[in-house]
Amino acid sequence: MYTNYMSWQKKLFFGLLGGVILVVLLIVAVAKFGQKKEPITITYWGLWEPEEVIKPLIAEFETVHPDIKVNYVFQSQREYRERLQNALSQGRGPDVFRIHNTWLPMFKSELSPVPFTEFESIYPPVVSYDFRLGSNYMAVPLMYDGLALYTNDELFDQGGKTIPTSWEELRKTAVELSVCDSVDGRCTRGDKILISGAAMGTADNVDHWQDVLGIIMMQNNVNLSLPQGQSAEESLQYYTIFNRADHVWDSTLPSSTSMFAAGKLAMYFAPSWRVFEIKETNPKLKFSVHPLPQLPLDISRGEKPTTWATYWAEGVSKKSQNTTAAWEWVKFLSSKESLTKMYQTASGIREFGEIYPRIDMQASLINAPYVGPVVSQVANARSWYLTGFTFDGPTGINTKISNYFADAINSINQGRQPSEVTKTLSAGVNQVLSQYGLATQLAAPAN
């Protein structure tokens, strides 16, 4: 009987002990479960889009992801690339940031690979090419832009001209639409230019001259990494002929954007974002936007038009402590729904929003004023490190390469032999590219 009593007491003790332990565990679990998790904050450096365009998307994202907060910091383009790289190198940079499509060589060591699949089926070939690094993609675009031909409607109507579709037509039209302060109004002797037919030929006052020369060379099958040989020489001669022989453009004139906005320039090359500046400067100016002229194409040989892309994309810092959350934000922004909302909001404060980068959305803009011609060129677009207005600063890849091409333009205008000019140009370009592991072995020109 005593033994049974002791056994009963032991069972009671362990039962009570087990109950206490269970209660304690339940209390701890409930306390832990009920404890509010501190949200993650990701910092997003943006360009071009004001806070009022991004804020509604942040609110929507944070509703769906209550554990993630987004801090949007609108950046000035001035010294942006240097400021961004310095911050990233010092470990105090943003989680998400915007880079130009030509900046991958400068940022490849700072970027976290895109974790999404089906990249190539969503974006046009130029995007896949620009941001591919090995087997990975390194940034996701929320917009697209490219070089287009702007024309002054009134000058074309007065001259009875049609929009040129080839470079030879463009040159002929430029000469015929130009007006100089001469006896007969023609511009054959270098008289003061009153109305210019086309802004081409110089490197100091033609906005986006890099893009214009770049596309002329690409269409002429010039290897921009090794710009020498007959095709490169011909391209430089064609670009400069508007200054040195046709006298329809010179360095005494204001910038091409200012001339076009003033109604004194018939043809002008620029991306779509220049529409905003032109409209603001001269709301009454009647102008149109068109696809780029092309060199003659042999369709039977499979030759296709070549156009020029210049756009921006979102990357995630490799040093971010919250790469998963950062990519979740970029994935949300790059969805069809978010891009549509962003475009609509932006269109409420300016002429139009940023052009959709996704293949499955571009058809909706193909007939839109100003942007339609840019969209129509996406499939055949290419790009390179000879791009204007990337704001990459004096040590940026575009600026350094542009300096060598500007010297080449000036040398041709001063009468130097094209073969000597391109030899110097190739050496300079090669020197810049070698800093990024992109140099091409210098050799005798193939043509």
Describe these PLM feature segments.
Residues 38-49, 68-73, 95-96, 138, ...:
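Short, well-ordered beta-strand elements
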Residues 174-175, 222-253, 292-295:
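Glycine-centered hinge/linker elements that transmit conformational signals in sensory
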Residues 99-148, 171, 187-197, 209-212, ...:
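Hinge/lid segment of periplasmic solute-binding proteins
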Residues 1-43, 430-447:
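Short, low-complexity disordered leader/linker segments with a strong preference
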Residues 60-126, 130-132, 154-165, 266-267, ...:
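Extracytoplasmic "Venus flytrap"/periplasmic binding protein-like
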Residues 49-69, 401, 405:
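Short, polar/charged alpha-helical segment
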Residues 64, 69-71, 137, 158, ...:
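Extracytoplasmic/periplasmic substrate-recognition and gating elements
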Residues 368-430:
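C-terminal capping/gating helix-and-loop segments adjacent to ligand/active sites or protein-protein/ligand interfaces
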